[in-house]
Amino acid sequence: VEVEDAQYCAVVASGLLACTIPFLAFASAHSHVLVADTVYGPTRRFCDRTLKRLGVEIDYFDPLAGAGVDKLIRPNTHLIFLESPGSMTFEISDAPAIAAAARAKNVVTVLDNTWSGGVFHKPLALGIDVSVQANTKYASGGADVINGSILTNREDLISRMKETITDLGINVAPDDAYLVLRGLRSIETRMARHQSSGLEVARWLKQRPEVQRVLHPALEDDPGH
């Protein structure tokens, strides 16, 4: 099953590791990274606790900035990290515009693609350099493994990230890799049902007087639709 249409993939021991490895591979003391304001909470905590302590400069940006992210890029910006849909608030970022702005200044882009399971959203096809996801969520399918994946079509980037993985000694156990491969056999069927069921619940909630707002990008009146 092809879920991300990527040429290269590295598997790590958790989804959070998949998110943090690109930072460790491409950022260093005195370098600058841009992080979307709505990324996964533990990813943001890693930036605030660990990266800042290592001397990395971090700015959080509006996930709806689109091409406007160009104005935030500095000469020492090495990485732009975003999540789309945004974690918990589900904004849809203009990934192609962000990728184009970054590419023009030789900045690596990384997108946390966990919410789509790699099925509904193809970041690499939109120009993003690296797509990461927590296989723990959807790819495994059995709630019996903690795992993450890092995907790209660039050999230079995967080589750098694999070096970081090796240096930190965080290679994944073979049994865990097997469990994810098992789950991928049914991911398209499962994600289709997740999507239809979730949308049905979202539409029901919109009719409820107790609910002020429903955050779901598949709703026709959602800004990210």
Residue spans of the language-model regions?
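Conserved PLP-enzyme active-site core in the AAT-like
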Residues: 8-207, 215, 220-221
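Contiguous C-terminal substrate-recognition/catalytic subdomains in enzyme active sites
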Residues: 223-225
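Portal/gating segments that form or line small-molecule/metal binding sites
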Residues: 5
